[in-house]
Structures are given as structure tokens and as C-alpha cells.
């Protein structure tokens, strides 16, 4: 299998959940005998003007001759988000099967209207139920390998309550309210690679007890200092950082969107994001050793239940069979 990613941005510069989902799928395909390359459409966003290799994956800026060579080289294309429309068009021109990584529940009309071969990879059962595109599909939750993300640090010795991405949707303004209500506690706020809504930006103006850190490709360093992860998100189709944190036994307090509930299951602690006092009270409860031990154990168990190896194997088989079927019909 020779898989071409047709996407806008990629790690290590762009550190969002969608890009890391793509990257872990790419790594798995390559580790199991396939080959993967990334066409980086918005390379100029980070002033990238030459090919680079990240974690074994080759990434190419969109030079005209390079684009044609990559498309000719490929057996199939995978895309998501910003370059869905472009990829549908170019896949038809080059007669390649196209796989769509679905990270949210917004309907993409071009996917609805697109002629076969289109294949859908939903990031949650909830997203599949909401969208139900009329194309062959599979559900693969964002791969978070606990063997990689477990910091092997006992989080009960940590002090920080952490929020990753300080935009409006993720609750950067709510972090401020919680931190102001708990001046005796320490907080970490990590800025994100994007802001939703964009015009509101990142809420970096935080109280003195909040350490604001820049976005980082080494998020484990943050988890190694984290006692509790908070996710007061308005919208979250899955919430990858919750899974990552649970790998180290870090309890997650979240707003309980359908995606977060599917992700965290019984290990999650859920509150309306506008009820700040409930968040404050729950944080204080988790400084009780017995309460923390129970929540931490549940988080770690849940992360092991989400072991991605079986679902990644199912995805490889789904993609290989889809490519084989396409070649047979061609």
C-alpha cells in the first residue's frame, strides 16, 4: 500500500488532534509494510519550503511537479478537513480511491455528493451516527498508544491542573475563572495550534497561579507535571488529550460532550462548563488521596481499554481491501 496524505498541516509544527490521528495511522501503515508520504498543502503557514521527515514519515511542500509525482506514485489518497474538496477532485482525475478522516460532525456536502470510490474513517461511533455518509466506512477512534503516552510518573505527586488549548471552544476563559477561584492551586495552560472561533484567539491573560506554556510536540513533558486534566469544551467530537492523559492515570474532568463521554466512559468526571463552582469543588475533591486514587485507577484502566492496536489492524485491512477492490474494477 502506497498512501498519500493530502492535508493542510502536520506535526511537529502543527500539534492538533486531527494531525496526530493521521500521523499515528501513517506510522502504523509504515510499520506494517506500507509506504506513506504527506503532501503538505499549507506549508507556507510555517514557512516550510523543503521536504522533511518527521518520525519516519516524509512530508513534502506543494510544488507542482512534486504534487504530480506523489499522485502518480500513490495507490490511494487520505485527506481531512480543509483539503477535502481539492482531494475529491484530484482523486477523480488520477483515479485513486480516497479515504476521508472524519474528526467532527459537520456535514461535508462534497463527500455526500462525491462519486465512488470514497471511504469514510469516523473517529467515533457518535460521529458515525450523526453523519452516516452513504459510502463504505469504518470507525477508528484516535489512536493513543498507552505504551507511548504513559509518563511512568505517579500523577498523585503532581500539583498542576492542566488545560490544553486556551481558545474559546476549549475553555481558556473558564480556566481563568477556575484558577481565580483556587488561588492556592497551580495550573498549566498550553496554547493551541488553532483558535475556535479564530477572532477570539487564545486566552493567555491568566491569573498568576497559571503557567502558560507554548504549544509543544512533546506533550508528555506537560503530562509529567499534571495532576488533573480539565476539558471544559463547548464542542468535542472525541478529545484526544483526554485519552493521552488517562494513559498516565491522570483523571479527566470534562464538559461531557457526546464524544468525550464515548472517549472517557465511566472514568470521566462530567460537568456543565458554565457551572464553574462544580468544577472547583471536583478539583478540590481530587486532592483527597482516596478520591484521587480511585479516579486515577479508573483513568488508567480506561486508557488500556482504548488500546489502538486492534482497531489499527482493522483499518489496515479495510484500506488494503478497498484498494484491491478498486484496482480489480479499474
Role assignments for model-derived ranges:
Residues 251-254:
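Short hydrophobic beta-strand element within catalytic cores of glycosyltransferases
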Residues 234:
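Aromatic "clamp/platform" in nucleotide-sugar-dependent glycosyltransferases that forms part
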Residues 146-206, 212:
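Conserved catalytic-core segment of nucleotide-activated headgroup transferases in glycan assembly
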Residues 268-276, 284-290:
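Conserved acidic donor-binding segment of nucleotide-sugar-dependent glycosyltransferases
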Residues 222, 257-270:
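Short acidic/histidine- and often glycine-rich active-site loop of Leloir-type glycosyltransferases
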Residues 71, 215-216, 221-226:
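Short alpha-helical donor nucleotide-sugar binding micro-motif in glycosyltransferases
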Amino acid at each position: 500500500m502506497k498512501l498519500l496524505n493530502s492535508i493542510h498541516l502536520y506535526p511537529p509544527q502543527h500539534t492538533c488532534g486531527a494531525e496526530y490521528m493521521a500521523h499515528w495511522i501513517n506510522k502504523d501503515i509504515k510499520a506494517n509494510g506500507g509506504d506513506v508520504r504527506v503532501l503538505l498543502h499549507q506549508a507556507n503557514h510555517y514557512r516550510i519550503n523543503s521536504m522533511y521527515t518527521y518520525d519516519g514519515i516524509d512530508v513534502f511542500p506543494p510544488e507542482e511537479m512534486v504534487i504530480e509525482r506523489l499522485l502518480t506514485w500513490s495507490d490511494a489518497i487520505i485527506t481531512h478537513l480543509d483539503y477535502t474538496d481539492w482531494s475529491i477532485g484530484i482523486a477523480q482525475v488520477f483515479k485513486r480511491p480516497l479515504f476521508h478522516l472524519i474528526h467532527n460532525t459537520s456535514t461535508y456536502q462534497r463527500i455526500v455528493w462525491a462519486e465512488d470510490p470514497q471511504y469514510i474513517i469516523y473517529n467515533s461511533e457518535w460521529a458515525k451516527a450523526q453523519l452516516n455518509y452513504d459510502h463504505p466506512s469504518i470507525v477508528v477512534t484516535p489512536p493513543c498508544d498507552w505504551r507511548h503516552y504513559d509518563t511512568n510518573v505517579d500523577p498523585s505527586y503532581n500539583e498542576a491542573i492542566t488545560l490544553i488549548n486556551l481558545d474559546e471552544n476549549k475553555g481558556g476563559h473558564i480556566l481563568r475563572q477556575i484558577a481565580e477561584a483556587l488561588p492556592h492551586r497551580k495550573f498549566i495552560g498550553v496554547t493551541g495550534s488553532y483558535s475556535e472561533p479564530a477572532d477570539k484567539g487564545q486566552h493567555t491573560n491568566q491569573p498568576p497561579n497559571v503557567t502558560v506554556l507554548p504549544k509543544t510536540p512533546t506533550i508528555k513533558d506537560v503530562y509529567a507535571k499534571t495532576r488533573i486534566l480539565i476539558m471544559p469544551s463547548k464542542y468535542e467530537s472525541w478529545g484526544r488529550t483526554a485519552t493521552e492523559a488517562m494513559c498516565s492515570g491522570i483523571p479527566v474532568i470534562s464538559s461531557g460532550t457526546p464524544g468525550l463521554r464515548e472517549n472517557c466512559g465511566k472514568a470521566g468526571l462530567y460537568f456543565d462548563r458554565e457551572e464553574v463552582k462544580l468544577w472547583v469543588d471536583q478539583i478540590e475533591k481530587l486532592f483527597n488521596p482516596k478520591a484521587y486514587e480511585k479516579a486515577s485507577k479508573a483513568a488508567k484502566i480506561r486508557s488500556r481499554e482504548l488500546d489502538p492496536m486492534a482497531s489499527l489492524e482493522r483499518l489496515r485491512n479495510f484500506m488494503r481491501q478497498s484498494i484491491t477492490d478498486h484496482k480489480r474494477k479499474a
